[in-house]
C-alpha cells in the first residue's frame, strides 16, 4: 500500500512540475526500500536536470507524501527521500537519454550479429528512440584512443538498442 502511494505521489508531482516548467521530467531510476522509509529517485530531462530542479522536485514530493493521511509513516515524515540526476559515468538506463547525449563521446558494450561481445568508443551521431522508432538504435562514429580523440576513419556503426549491454557517456577533457 505504501509503495503504491509513493509511486502515485511521485508520478503526480512530476506531471505537475513538468507542466508548469514546460520541460518534461522523466524517471531514470526509482527505488523504494525499507517499507517506504527510503526513497531514491533519479530523474532527467532532455536538456539535463539541475540541482535546483532536483531540490524543487524533492520538496514537492515530500510535501505531497506528508499530506497523505492514508499512511501514518508518510504523513509524519518518517522517511528519507533522495532526488538526484544521473551522475557522470553512470550507464544510460532509459532510451530517451541517448537524445540528450548526441554529439558526445560514448562507450558501448554490445552483442554483434553473432552474439559476440563487442565494445566501441565514439561520437554518438544518431539515436532512433521512442514510440516512432520501428527499430530503436544508435549510430556511433568510432574514435581512436589517445590524448587527442579523432575519428578512426571507419564508417559509422549502427547498433540496435536491444543488443546494447551497457552504454556510458565518457568525459572529455
Curated annotation (Swiss-Prot):
Identify the domain of life: Bacteria
Looking at the UniProt entry, the stretches that span the membrane are none
Which Gene Ontology CC terms are recorded?
cytosol
GO terms for biological process, alphabetical: ribosomal small subunit assembly; translation
Where is this protein localized, as stated in its record?
Answer: Cytoplasm
**Lineage, please?**
Bacteria, Pseudomonadati, Chlorobiota, Chlorobiia, Chlorobiales
Entries under InterPro entries matching the protein: Ribosome_maturation_RimP (IPR003728), RimP_C (IPR028998), RimP_N (IPR028989), RimP_N_sf (IPR035956)
Keyword tags: Cytoplasm, Ribosome biogenesis
Write down what this protein is called: Ribosome maturation factor RimP
According to its UniProt entry, the function of this protein is described as: Required for maturation of 30S ribosomal subunits.
* Similarity remark: Belongs to the RimP family.
Amino acid at each position: 500500500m505504501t509503495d503504491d502511494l509513493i509511486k502515485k505521489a511521485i508520478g503526480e508531482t512530476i506531471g505537475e512540475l513538468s507542466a508548469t516548467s514546460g520541460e518534461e521530467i522523466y524517471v531514470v531510476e526509482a527505488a523504494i526500500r525499507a517499507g517506504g522509509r527510503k526513497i531514491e529517485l533519479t530523474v532527467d530531462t532532455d536538456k539535463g536536470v539541475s540541482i535546483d530542479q532536483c531540490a524543487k522536485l524533492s520538496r514537492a514530493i515530500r510535501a505531497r507524501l506528508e499530506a497523505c493521511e492514508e499512511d501514518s509513516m508518510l504523513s509524519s515524515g518518517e522517511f528519507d527521500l533522495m532526488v538526484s540526476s544521473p551522475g557522470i559515468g553512470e550507464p544510460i538506463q532509459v532510451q530517451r537519454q541517448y537524445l540528450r547525449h548526441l554529439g558526445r563521446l560514448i562507450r558501448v558494450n554490445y552483442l554483434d550479429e553473432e552474439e559476440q561481445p563487442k565494445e566501441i568508443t565514439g561520437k554518438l551521431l544518431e539515436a532512433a528512440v521512442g514510440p516512432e522508432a520501428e527499430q530503436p538504435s544508435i549510430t556511433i562514429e568510432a574514435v581512436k584512443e589517445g590524448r587527442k580523440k579523432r575519428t578512426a576513419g571507419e564508417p559509422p556503426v549502427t547498433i540496435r538498442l536491444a543488443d546494447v549491454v551497457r552504454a556510458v557517456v565518457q568525459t572529455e577533457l
